[in-house]
């Protein structure tokens, strides 16, 4: 009986401790919960529920790929989220219970991508819009967790519908809009049908980016790629007015929100946040933010609201003085590296293409400084740097002076990883030319070269420093003898994709790896077996580190996410 159990069965799950990041590219992805205490937003395939005051986090995990849209019911009881998947495959919608933080139902009908979701005002129905390959609109019963009916979202001679919004008063009416199409739908429950009526805009042809409904259902407003706003009447299905006539919003109206007191909050693709009123739509108040605005979410009636941008900034704005406060910021592109300072687990630094950020581990907060990437000796007197051309440079650093001691030219391709021995007399560099070189830092020359048929991505010294472990694009983890460069053993590190990051504990008992399979794996060094697996990244993991003192594992990925995991063993 025992021999049938797969080795994967004994692998424990790694506990996710904290997430730093926000995917600002999801339209209306940032939501303030009706309890006014929590922000809800997607990051990769995870949905974060974060307390506004205490920053405490909960995670909703269940999607197999990136979350593409998010909706919260008006009562706050339910959250719905949709995902992207591969062409031809079914994309899931997941219905979550907010209070219990658990999955209620998985709704699968659409193919490829879920474009948008909306709840009816009394939590009776959920409407979903499929992506370009799917093109259908489906109404789901929340009580039965099943589809009521569906229909093609747009006519034959127009583009795709990309936005959906429910009526604020009636459970039977909703609006879809997109490229050249604006439709008001009526749900006919006894016959299980939805009936569309095309809205007339005359000569005006527009691509709709965002949509907002007035509280009394008197009008709905459409933000367009042209940079103007259309005001439509849902009863007559006619255009009431459009504007502004001049000075349209640059890069389109990407977010729109109706306020109870009258007027609109409008966000543009150029990062301009504006309060304006029909029919002129001229700015009454305005703020410039960093990155195109993708979400505006009200806290309560709108006395305070939150704004999310493409550059992963979250702002809090109070309506009365219209001043913004940056409350969260993180990398919006691939994170390239992580490093902990010597002997402290309190801080760590991450770098992306354009910025370096230093984070405080327990509070996950950051400040911005310059841009570079280096490896240092523990006495801080030398810096060893590797370049894209394969050169390894040793620099001597004094209080006022920086001197290049030696340029070591052996590698033929870029240096991907540098590790320094504890006594600062030796270092190892891994390169994508398929070599690892062990350098003598006293005589500044090569000690040993290791060759393999792979592009090396990472290397680690075992703490006793007579062995090194390497991994790279061939998915194998190799143990090597430092003295003569011979291979001791090879492990199959991943079933799919390169291993990009690796780190080893101070005792050398366990090590961690991460790569293109999006999994964080904890290994037993001597047994060569996986003991724990962490699922949470949806981009390729680029680097991984264990904090000094073995409290946390921090992993970063190509989608800009930083995940902090609880280290599974007590040191």
UniProtKB/Swiss-Prot annotation:
Q: Which GO terms describe its biological process?
A: flagellated sperm motility
In which ranges do the WD repeats occur? 62-106, 109-150, 156-195, 288-327, 330-364, 366-405, 410-449, 451-490, 494-533, 536-571
| SMART domains associated with the record | WD40
Q: Does the keyword Transferase apply?
A: no
Keywords, comma-separated and alphabetical: Cell projection, Cilium, Cytoplasm, Cytoskeleton, Flagellum, Repeat, WD repeat
User: Assembly state and interactors?
Assistant: Microtubule inner protein component of sperm flagellar doublet microtubules. Interacts with BRCA2. Interacts with the CCT chaperonin complex. Interacts with HSP70. Interacts with AK8. Interacts with CFAP45. Interacts with DNAI1. Interacts with IQDC.
Kindly provide the name given to this protein in its UniProt entry. Answer: Cilia- and flagella-associated protein 52
Q: Which organism is it from?
A: Macaca fascicularis
Chain's gene name: CFAP52
